[in-house]
């Protein structure tokens, strides 16, 4: 009988061996996968938080190192001064200031006034006669005087000048000259006084609109040069903005009543002392 291959069904021990080999392969693959995976980051320790101290609050009432500069204003009302206040005053002006000398009743101070004087002629024209008969400028005469306060009023004779630039230039030059000659003196610019309604209606260059424009120049120059400015005009201005007829001879120059109002205003608007000085002294005594 020729030989034949006979197939036999595998035994159970071969099946068990195959199963064990498959299980081992799966376990090895799982181990490789686990080794390739990155390890989890270890938990970080919590860092302490630094708390900055709060900035200290500065009380509002603590004064600053540099005091704020007080705004410039015209001379304010103060307690009335007696006439000795005017002992060291030099009054500088034109015919209006000469009228004040004659009709105010003030018998103190020294007067340097020339009829027709202007801010230009005060420095450029030798129209002041000295005691020994020499002719010098008004500015030179004031320079030689011993005074602690200079009260200046000029401008009525310049109202016909073109615009205000020429007036401003000469007025500033005069103020600088007075300051240079008397560096320790109080320079007080007095406002120009208004004219009457009758004079204002004439159509002349001597009118209240021009006077207001010149007063604006004086006020600006006083601030720029560090001088005082006394608004005399408000003492002799009526509700219509004009000089009351009962205060003037001719609508331009003041009579006795007008000069008294002028002097009273000067007495209650003094310079060289705080406006509240009298009240503070009285409070300290009481």
PLM regions and their residue ranges:
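N-terminal Sec-pathway targeting helices
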Residues: 3-20
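Alpha/beta-hydrolase-fold catalytic nucleophile elbow
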Residues: 153, 190-191
């Amino acid at each position: 009988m020729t030989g034949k291959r006979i197939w036999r069904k595998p035994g159970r021990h071969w099946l068990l061996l195959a199963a064990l080999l498959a299980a081992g392969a799966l376990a090895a693959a799982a181990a490789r996968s686990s080794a390739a995976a990155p390890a989890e980051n270890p938990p970080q320790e919590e860092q302490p938080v630094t708390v900055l101290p709060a900035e200290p609050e500065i009380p509002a009432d603590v004064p600053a190192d540099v005091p704020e500069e007080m705004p410039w204003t015209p001379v304010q009302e103060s307690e009335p001064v007696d006439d000795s206040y005017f002992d060291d005053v030099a009054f500088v002006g034109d015919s209006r200031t000469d009228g004040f000398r004659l009709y105010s009743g003030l018998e103190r101070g020294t007067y340097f006034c020339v009829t027709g004087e202007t801010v230009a002629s005060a420095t450029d024209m030798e129209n002041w006669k000295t005691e020994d008969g020499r002719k010098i400028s008004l500015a030179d005469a004031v320079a030689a005087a011993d005074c602690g306060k200079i009260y200046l009023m000029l401008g009525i004779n310049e109202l016909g000048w073109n615009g205000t630039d020429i007036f401003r230039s000469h007025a500033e030059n005069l103020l600088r000259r007075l300051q240079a000659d008397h560096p320790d003196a109080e320079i007080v610019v007095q406002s120009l006084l208004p004219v009457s309604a009758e004079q204002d209606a004439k159509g002349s260059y001597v009118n209240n609109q021009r006077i207001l424009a010149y007063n604006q120049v004086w006020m600006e120059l006083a601030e720029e040069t560090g001088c005082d400015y006394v608004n005399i005009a408000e003492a002799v201005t009526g509700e219509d903005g004009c000089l009351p007829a009962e205060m003037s001879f001719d609508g331009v120059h003041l009579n006795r009543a007008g000069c008294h109002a002028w002097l009273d205003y000067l007495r209650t608007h003094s310079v060289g002392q705080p406006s509240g000085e009298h009240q503070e002294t009285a409070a300290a005594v009481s």
